[in-house]
Amino acid sequence: MAIDGDPPIDLIGCWEAAGHGDPDLQSGQWLTSSLLLIEEGPELWRLVADAIRAAPADFIVDTKVDGFRWLCPLDRAASLRDFLAFESHVLRGAERRKSTVPEYWYEAPVYYKGNHRAILGPDDECEWPSFTHRLDFELEVAMIVGVGGRDITHESASAHIFGFTVMNDFSARDVQAREMSAWLGPAKGKDFATALGPCIVTADELGSEPDLEMVCRVNGDEWGRARSGDAHWRWADMLAHVSDGEDVYPGDVYGSGTPGGCCGLDLGRELKPGDVIELEIESIGLLRNQIGPRPE
């Protein structure tokens, strides 16, 4: 864990050095699970931040040591929803279909439910699924819910946001197109992999509606660039919509959807085995994943 852009530190060591050890906090299990940490709520978050700020230098983790690697910053997602927040992407889709944007898109922030058990972390390989010939990526911001609730208002939404990370919404475009031609989905066209990382930056650092530069690169070549603040739908809109008459939970992940021109589909380009995708978002970091070999 890190704070204020400093190097990562040993959270367990910091917590013990600060003299904490409340047996009511799930017996300390949250020390090895970011989801449990999020579920504990704001009071614990403040204690953790204080312990980190007071940590001596010998708790800093050497990221250059052999064998060090970043893991997925969220060890378990409670759920995964991926929205379609950017009008620029929707307009490109309508142009490809020679149609117009559906009226309902302007009425509510639509989303699909993804596979929250198929989450990759930084530098994890994305296996090429045996059922697709057209693999793609999508550059997105992901928001992690911190405090659950129901019927959340736009005005109170910021209190429910834990933080943000970079998200790669891997997509099997041929399968996705066939599924959605049957008026449902996507399903297998998306469910095989979603990547998150390299870290979660909390909302107290970025604000609840951050406007951040977003860049996607494949094999070092820039494919697209955008700003998260250009989204038509805000995080408050998404939280208010999802929580209308139903509960949302700590650790729920909301993907923003990709901006126009920040995926292969919008650019008429496709991935191939061995490609390295780098997605970078200002103030969060760079998420890198490589595409695995195509199955025989």
Regions found by a protein language model. Give the residues of each.
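Short, structured patches in soluble enzyme cores that scaffold and shape functional sites
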Residues: 114-116, 123, 130, 137-147, ...
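Residue "hotspots" at secondary-structure boundaries inside conserved domains
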Residues: 72, 78, 104, 133-135, ...
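A generic local secondary-structure boundary/capping motif
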Residues: 69-72, 99-102, 126-135, 140-141, ...
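Catalytic-pocket segment enriched in acidic/His residues
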Residues: 42-49, 53, 63-64, 173-296
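A gly/proline- and charged-residue-enriched helix-loop-helix capping module
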Residues: 102-123
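A short secondary-structure junction signal
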Residues: 91-95, 122-125, 130-131, 152-157, ...
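N-terminal non-catalytic cap/leader segment that marks the start of a structured domain
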Residues: 1-109, 276-280
